[in-house]
């Protein structure tokens, strides 16, 4: 998925603003099994999935608990690291060979103060993530694992 498609999923940005954002991105490839984000580390980058699938998990009592699966177009960020500059609790592992766009957190924050459209995109992203988190929480509290899996397949059929 092209970066323009990824960005415009959240907020349609003028080309000039999108070009400013594009200039700060680097495209990278990683193999299946690579940990894009690691628990216990302060992450300095944000990733967008151009091609691939990722799972986010945390460990509890020696077990990995997957709480999110992302596909092409998804954004990978440790919110704890992004917001508070603290080590994150999640690990994000690639489920197949993948191509990602990488954006340094400090560059994004600078763009927020320089470009209103990029700042509005960031605000919209935060709003959408809050809604998605709320939906996951309600789902986890109200459904057994098989029901959650069925719901995932219905929402994300590909």
Language-model regions: role of each:
Residues 1-27, 81:
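Cyclic nucleotide-binding regulatory module and flanking cytosolic helices
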Residues 28-30, 70:
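Hydrophobic residues at beta-strand termini and immediately following loops
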Residues 9, 35-96:
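Cyclic nucleotide-binding regulatory domains
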Residues 3, 17-20, 78, 107, ...:
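Hydrophobic alpha-helical segments typical of transmembrane helices
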């Amino acid at each position: 998925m092209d970066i323009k498609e990824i960005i415009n999923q959240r907020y349609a940005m003028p080309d000039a603003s999108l070009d400013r954002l594009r200039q700060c991105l680097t495209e990278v490839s990683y193999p299946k099994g690579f940990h894009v984000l690691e628990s216990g580390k302060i992450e300095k980058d944000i990733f967008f999935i151009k091609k691939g699938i990722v799972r986010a998990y945390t460990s509890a009592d020696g077990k990995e608990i997957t709480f999110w699966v992302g596909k092409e177009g998804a954004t990978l960020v440790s919110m704890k690291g992004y917001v508070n500059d603290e080590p994150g609790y999640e690990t994000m592992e690639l489920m197949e060979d993948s191509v990602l766009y990488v954006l340094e957190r400090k560059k994004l924050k600078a763009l927020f103060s320089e470009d209103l459209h990029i700042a509005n995109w960031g605000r919209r992203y935060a709003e959408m993530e809050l809604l998605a988190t709320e939906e996951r929480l309600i789902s986890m509290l109200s459904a057994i694992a098989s029901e959650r899996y069925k719901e995932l397949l219905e929402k994300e059929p590909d």
